[in-house]
């Protein structure tokens, strides 16, 4: 478990104190994929770099298991960092080394015997699907392949925690999806705790179990991704969700003005996403409906659907009760 206890970070610039991260309390469970999302300058990179003390905290405590990371001396810090792997936005590969040489590098630094290094490198390149590229150099690789090398290198010392600092923001959508799929597979098969920072809610939706939302150095919302994504509370979170769903709130409200009736948002979760609930309830209650917006997608492995519909006529009270009885979440947008 990773636990932040009133951890905070400030800088002194020209005699002024700049707060990068306000005091926060947060727990990340063992084996979970935890997302940290925020706009540029929100403090997310500072937060993740406090975990392995690439940034020194200004106050508070950070516990990994029972160990107080903030109290470690240099020897303890070196031991900690061998248990924490990290991948970066711009890969940070050594251009003069081959793919295999990059993956071997952290093992060489700790004096691992050559035979063990060779076996470990072969195992890791097979895991990330780069066996055929072992003797190529970074300049010969695509962006996605470079990030896979970065992942293999981060796993070389057998870490318990993997930190991902904007690991997909330099990649195209298709490559992003493949890298996220690889991270999910690593989490399942190795049981690693993965802490992933991003400015894209779609990345959080695809791979994370829980999420923390940062805004101007403050933790403004946290919880299971399903709950935060479907029921965002803070204005920053709502903006991230709207961007991920490609919703234009102003345009949507113009659509509201063009139709009559009660407007509701219906949220379907799990297998109920694929049931013909709307049509059945419309027939049973005599309610007419006009679909203004809709989507079906997944939050990690869980299917979900959302419809914004205008309801007119019929027994709308019975229709609402029918939706609730069917496990559909109903939110009134206009009564």
Swiss-Prot record:
The keyword Isomerase does not apply. CDD domains: ABC_MetN_methionine_transporter. Residues 2-241 form the ABC transporter domain. Keywords: Amino-acid transport, ATP-binding, Cell inner membrane, Cell membrane, Membrane, Nucleotide-binding, Translocase, Transport. It catalyses: L-methionine(out) + ATP + H2O = L-methionine(in) + ADP + phosphate + H(+); D-methionine(out) + ATP + H2O = D-methionine(in) + ADP + phosphate + H(+). One of its GO terms (molecular function) is ABC-type D-methionine transporter activity. It comes from the Bacteria. Coiled coil: none annotated. It is an enzyme of class 7 (translocase). Its EC number is 7.4.2.11. ATP binds at residues 38-45. It is found in: Cell inner membrane. Its main location: membrane. Belongs to the ABC transporter superfamily. Methionine importer (TC 3.A.1.24) family. The complex is composed of two ATP-binding proteins (MetN), two transmembrane proteins (MetI) and a solute-binding protein (MetQ). Part of the ABC transporter complex MetNIQ involved in methionine import. Responsible for energy coupling to the transport system. This is Methionine import ATP-binding protein MetN. The gene is metN.
């Amino acid at each position: 478990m990773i636990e932040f206890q009133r951890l905070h970070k400030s800088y002194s610039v020209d005699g002024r104190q700049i707060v990068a991260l306000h005091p926060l309390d947060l727990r990340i469970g063992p084996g979970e994929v935890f997302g940290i999302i925020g706009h540029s300058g929100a403090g997310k990179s500072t937060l993740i770099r406090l975990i392995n003390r690439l940034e020194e905290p200004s106050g508070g405590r950070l516990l990994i298991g029972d160990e107080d990371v903030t109290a470690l001396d240099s020897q303890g810090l070196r031991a900690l960092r061998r248990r924490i792997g990290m991948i970066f936005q711009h890969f940070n590969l050594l251009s003069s080394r081959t793919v295999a040489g990059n993956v071997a590098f952290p093992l060489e630094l700790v004096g691992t015997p050559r035979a063990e290094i060779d076996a470990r490198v072969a195992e890791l390149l097979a895991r990330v699907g780069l066996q055929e590229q072992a003797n190529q150099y970074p300049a010969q690789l695509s962006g996605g392949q470079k990030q896979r090398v970065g992942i293999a290198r981060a796993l070389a010392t057998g870490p318990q925690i993997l930190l991902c600092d904007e690991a997909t923001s330099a990649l195209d959508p298709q490559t992003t999806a493949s890298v996220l799929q690889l991270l999910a597979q690593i989490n399942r098969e190795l049981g690693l705790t993965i802490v992933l920072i991003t400015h894209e809610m779609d990345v959080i939706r695809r791979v994370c179990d829980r999420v923390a939302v940062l805004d101007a150095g403050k933790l403004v919302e946290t919880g299971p991704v399903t709950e935060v994504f479907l029921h965002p509370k803070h204005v920053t979170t709502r903006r991230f969700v709207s961007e991920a769903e490609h919703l234009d709130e102003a345009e949507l409200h113009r659509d509201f003005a063009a139709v009559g009736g009660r407007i509701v948002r219906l949220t379907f979760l799990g297998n109920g996403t694929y049931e013909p609930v709307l049509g059945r309830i419309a027939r049973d209650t005599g309610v007419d409906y006009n679909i203004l917006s809709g989507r079906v997608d997944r939050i990690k492995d869980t299917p979900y659907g959302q419809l914004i519909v205008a309801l007119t006529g019929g027994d709308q009270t019975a229709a609402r009760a029918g939706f609730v009885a069917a496990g559909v979440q109903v939110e009134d947008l206009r009564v």
